Amino acid sequence: MTAIQQFFKTFFLTELLKGLALTGRYTFKRKFTVQFPEEKTPISPRFRGLHALRRYENGEERCIACKLCEAVCPALAITIESETRADNTRRTTRYDIDLTKCIFCGFCEESCPVDSIVETQILEYHGEKRGDLYFTKDMLLAVGDRYEKEVAAAKAADARYR
């Protein structure tokens, strides 16, 4: 670029005028902003939100304590302890997920052989202190019990893609 061209660009403020023209073009176009608490956009059926533990229809928890979800978790957010029952089946005594560590990758859900751990469509949850986002087995089972119909419907809708 020659010195004369540079002089005219800076003297006549062409960059500024180009920026103002761009701003003016978008000023009168339709806005795409969503006012979140009042308006909500549709959520993908594959959205990965709050975790839940599921039960069978007879009320027994599905988790067989294989610890695959704990092994596959890249953030080390899952802690499982188990014991063997009288009928030689393993069940969890402790199943904790630290949501402050969790990256919501979905590996735990994919690795579970019995579809025990699932990620729900729940995206609005919070904690006022760090311990509020540490979910124990009872808390995860309560979430699963409360939202079982929605979880089952989402699993059925996604079954052909799995």
From Swiss-Prot:
Keywords: 4Fe-4S, Cell inner membrane, Cell membrane, Iron, Iron-sulfur, Membrane, Metal-binding, NAD, Quinone, Repeat, Translocase, Ubiquinone. It catalyses: a quinone + NADH + 5 H(+)(in) = a quinol + NAD(+) + 4 H(+)(out). [4Fe-4S] cluster 2 binds at residues 73, 102, 105, 108. One of its GO terms (cellular component) is plasma membrane. It comes from the Bacteria. Pfam families: Fer4_7 (PF12838). Its cofactor is [4Fe-4S] cluster. This is NADH-quinone oxidoreductase subunit I. The gene is nuoI.
